[in-house]
Regions:
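Two-component histidine phosphotransfer core
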Residues: 1-123, 130-133
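C-terminal end segment of the histidine kinase catalytic
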Residues: 125-156
Length: 156
């Protein structure tokens, strides 16, 4: 379990590598509410979402693309969102996306760590691209999973 600030430090390092690969084709913007800095966040929660945005949204796009990462407090919850202006998907395929490895692993981790105290949504913003939003309890650490539990969950 990391604090949101440490998770973002890791994410910024990952983004720097991707920006070196994509050069001028990739812009990533962070809009982080300072009130969320001490919120506990599971390790590597956002990286797979940003990776999906870059790989499946921006990568196939012919021109430059943008990814936005936001964190803000909504009531008693921390709302994290990764949104891109990439190629997006048809409405009929939206539910299929949640069964991809990155999104399904993230959804499973959230269910294991927070039970019904989380929300995970994938939407198509009106301006295009894709958005993934996560809401988790702001001041309540997630249930820690042992390595054996995580391995068993991955095998299921």
């Amino acid at each position: 379990m990391l604090f949101r600030s440490a998770e973002l430090d890791f994410l910024r390092q990952y983004v720097a590598i991707e920006q070196a690969r994509f050069e001028d084709r990739l812009t990533v913007q962070f809009a982080i509410d300072p009130d969320t800095e001490d919120a506990p966040v599971p390790n590597f929660l956002l990286q797979p979402l940003v990776e999906n945005s870059i790989r499946h949204g921006i990568g196939p796009r012919p021109g430059p693309g943008h990814v936005w990462v936001t964190a803000r407090r909504v009531g008693d919850s921390l709302r994290l969102e990764v949104r891109d202006d990439g190629v997006g998907v048809d409405a009929g395929r939206l539910s299929d996306l949640e069964h991809g490895v990155g999104l399904s692993n993230t959804r499973s981790r959230l269910a294991h760590l927070y039970g019904d105290r989380h929300r995970f949504t994938v939407t198509r913003p009106p301006e295009g691209g894709l958005a993934v939003a996560i809401e988790i309890p702001m001041d309540e650490p997630a249930r820690e999973a042992s390595d054996a539990e995580l391995l068993a969950e991955g095998a299921a």
